[in-house]
């Protein structure tokens, strides 16, 4: 093994500035959108930090660590994916400057970790205020802070209400999972305001026979993951037929087998059958004559969700059907929306599965709405169990910055300069918010810093006009969990990268 492409420690932080500059314009209500052409030829229009980074094809290890950073924040918290990358990039940029000034990397690392502890303590002790978790208005304000900056800002309140309702239906935070307890079904037709949550499931399927019933009240439902057709031999078989009537007998034997299978099903009097596999035309005909509707070739995941809606098991063999395998629903209907047919199965109140229906005129908007809904659900899930709120609009970041400056005065060594440099780096969030509003950055940051130094820690940036406002008065709040996790991940990532002095790329000898 030989090593090539050795990079110096002070050089490999440059890529973090590139990533930071890419995401800066996506922060806040005045954020810009990115148009991404992915490797499958699809066009994605979004300002979601994690979505943008996820689609980048980058081989640089530092850039990959920042992308992983954003992904971690998205999985654990669901919000703050842009913030965490901007802070981490600023800390790496600062590390580069300090290393060039001959500061020891271990001294910088220790200062970073101390500053992190100080910041987390300050958020919990001085900035966090209690709030009524059962007050829907306060919860919606918190979710709006996250969702209001997205592409679908016009419909942000509706998405907030959907997110909160989805989480409140299942109060157990750890048990709530999208795609496990909830499904998001996207329907590309006009009428965003028609988006809603239903107690059941929606599948993009129609009945398999045009004359079968498309509307049934209190249906008895059977779920299968097997075929309803003549069972073919697993081994290859050849038949020689010398007489014409023998061919008719073979066809009749197949038909009798399918009629026998249909009669086995008929004994349990189901109104509706869902199966993951195929149903032959002969079986469809006999089931239709028996007044049984059939929907075939559904996804395995949808079949499992149906099982939760109707409270029954999925049957693998028709010969093993039992009475307990027949489930019940409140209502079944097939509706034509746009050019497609959608199957609605509405469960009873005890149903363990819900579907969030999203309507929008285009698939691009639907995809962005889904991303925003995931963020909203994540924030709502944390908010319901949160112990407090902190001011948004960069107020928290500026307050932490001022606190670190005050703490730096107790040091008389190198930590004095490093603490002040870290404090300056944390101003990246309010500074970026002001930049994106197109107003004088220096003037506004000095004004904000002045307000903060006068103990007005609630003052931050109003993201649409760039004005200095009292965040508590206008209800601009964030969750301390989001900010604390963003700081932890950003500082710890920067600390790990500080301990790397070389990047070595290995290649095998020929």
Report each predicted region and the residues it spans.
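Short, ordered loop/turn segments at secondary-structure junctions
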Residues: 38-40, 50, 89, 103-104, ...
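A structural-propensity feature for long, helix-poor, extended segments
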Residues: 101-149, 217, 320-351, 409-479
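Extended amphipathic alpha-helical scaffolds
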Residues: 1-45, 49-50, 117-360, 368
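Residue-level signature of catalytic and energy-coupling elements of molecular machines
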Residues: 28, 78, 102, 163, ...
């Amino acid at each position: 093994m030989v090593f090539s492409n050795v990079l110096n420690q002070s050089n490999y932080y440059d890529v973090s500035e590139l990533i930071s500059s890419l995401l800066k314009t996506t922060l806040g209500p005045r954020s810009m959108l990115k148009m991404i052409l992915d490797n499958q030829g699809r066009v994605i229009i979004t300002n979601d930090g994690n979505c943008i980074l996820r689609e980048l094809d980058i081989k640089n290890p530092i850039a990959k660590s920042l992308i992983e950073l954003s992904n971690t924040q998205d999985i654990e918290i669901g919000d703050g994916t842009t913030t965490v990358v901007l802070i981490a990039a600023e800390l790496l940029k600062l590390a580069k400057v300090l290393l060039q000034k001959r500061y020891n990397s271990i001294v910088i690392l220790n200062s970073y970790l101390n500053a992190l502890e100080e910041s987390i303590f300050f958020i919990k002790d001085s900035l966090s205020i209690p709030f009524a978790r059962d007050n829907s208005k306060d919860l919606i304000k918190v979710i709006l802070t996250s969702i209001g900056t997205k592409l679908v800002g016009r419909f942000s309140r509706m998405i907030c209400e959907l997110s909160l309702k989805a989480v409140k239906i299942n109060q157990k935070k750890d048990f709530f999972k999208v795609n496990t307890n909830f499904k998001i079904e996207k329907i590309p037709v006009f009428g965003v305001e028609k988006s809603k949550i239903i107690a059941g499931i929606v599948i993009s399927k129609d009945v398999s026979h045009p004359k079968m019933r498309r509307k049934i009240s209190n249906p008895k439902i059977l779920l299968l993951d097997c075929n309803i057709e003549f069972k073919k031999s697993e081994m290859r078989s050849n038949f020689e037929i010398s007489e014409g009537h023998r061919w008719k007998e073979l066809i009749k034997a197949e038909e009798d087998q399918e009629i026998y299978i249909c009669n086995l099903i008929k004994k349990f009097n189901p109104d509706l059958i869902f199966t993951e596999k195929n149903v032959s035309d002969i079986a469809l005909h006999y089931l239709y004559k028996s007044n049984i509707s059939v929907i075939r070739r559904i996804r395995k995941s949808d079949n499992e969700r149906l099982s939760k809606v109707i409270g029954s098991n999925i049957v693998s063999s028709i010969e093993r059907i039992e009475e307990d395998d027949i489930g019940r629903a409140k209502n079944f209907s097939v509706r034509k929306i746009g050019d497609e047919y959608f199957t609605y199965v509405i469960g009873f109140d005890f149903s363990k599965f819900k579907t969030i229906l999203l309507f929008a005129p285009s698939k691009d908007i639907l995809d962005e709405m889904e991303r925003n809904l995931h963020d909203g659900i994540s924030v709502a899930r944390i908010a319901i169990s949160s112990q407090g709120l902190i001011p948004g609009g960069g107020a928290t970041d500026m307050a932490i910055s001022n606190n670190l400056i005050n703490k730096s005065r107790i040091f008389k060594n190198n930590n004095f300069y490093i603490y002040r440099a870290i404090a300056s780096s944390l101003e990246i969030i309010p500074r970026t918010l002001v930049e994106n509003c197109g107003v004088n950055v220096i003037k506004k940051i000095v004004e904000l810093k002045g307000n903060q130094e006068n103990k007005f820690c609630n003052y931050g940036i109003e993201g649409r006009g760039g004005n200095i406002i009292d965040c508590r008065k206008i209800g601009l709040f964030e969750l301390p969990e989001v900010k604390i996790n963003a700081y932890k991940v950003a500082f710890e990532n920067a600390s790990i990268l500080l301990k790397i002095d070389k990047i070595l790329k290995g290649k095998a000898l020929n």
